[in-house]
């Protein structure tokens, strides 16, 4: 799905996630990377300035709930989750920003009271490495590039884009349309195959 072409055609949606949410009347949903590193995003296609505004207690709590639900749907009975901070060093007790104190921390505490096994806020520069090494089963990223860079650095062909919270199963490849190689017979279908396999995995445990 080419974002530029879609906007040129007058369509307001930022991506698949927003389109399917509108079509299904879904209010609470999130984008998730599913692969060797499993990451769900608090915000996606918006400016970094706007991403900071969207890191509210309610939104972070909603995403923690959705991630917990998604992991259970894939057969994990008691997922152990991590939540990244928004600021360097997760704010360092308010020295580098107070979103962790005002919004993210309270969301985590409420999730814990609901019985969700979740830790954080954890400094963004270490949380994804810990998740990859098995300390956590999945992680919440605060914004698009925070999660995308971590996932794509090693696992570009294995990352599948999922929308969690919809009444349907939705997965897709995690790369663009690549118009520059269209018709040349050199496209790699590995990621498409992986997207189908992940959809099957969600379906088995639905």
Feature locations, PLM:
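Anion-binding alpha/beta catalytic cores of soluble intermediary-metabolism enzymes, centered on
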Residues: 1-99, 105-206
């Amino acid at each position: 799905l080419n974002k530029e072409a879609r906007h040129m055609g007058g369509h307001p949606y930022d991506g698949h996630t927003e389109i399917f949410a509108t079509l299904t009347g879904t209010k609470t949903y999130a984008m998730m990377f599913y692969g060797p590193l499993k990451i769900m995003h608090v915000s996606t296609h918006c400016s970094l300035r706007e991403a900071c505004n969207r890191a509210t207690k309610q939104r972070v709590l909603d995403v923690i709930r959705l991630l917990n639900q998604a992991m259970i749907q894939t057969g994990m009975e008691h997922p152990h989750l991590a939540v990244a901070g928004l600021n360097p060093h997760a704010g360092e007790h308010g020295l580098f920003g107070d979103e962790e104190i005002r919004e993210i921390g309270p969301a985590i505490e409420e999730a814990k009271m609901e019985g969700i096994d979740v830790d954080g806020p954890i400094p963004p520069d270490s949380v994804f490495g810990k998740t990859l090494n098995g300390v956590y089963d999945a992680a919440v990223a605060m914004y698009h590039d925070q999660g995308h860079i971590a996932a794509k650095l090693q696992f570009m062909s294995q990352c599948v884009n999922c929308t969690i919270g919809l009444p349907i199963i939705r997965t897709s490849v995690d790369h663009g349309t690549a118009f520059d190689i269209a018709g040349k017979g050199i496209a790699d279908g590995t990621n498409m195959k992986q997207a189908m396999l992940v959809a099957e995995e969600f379906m088995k445990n639905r």
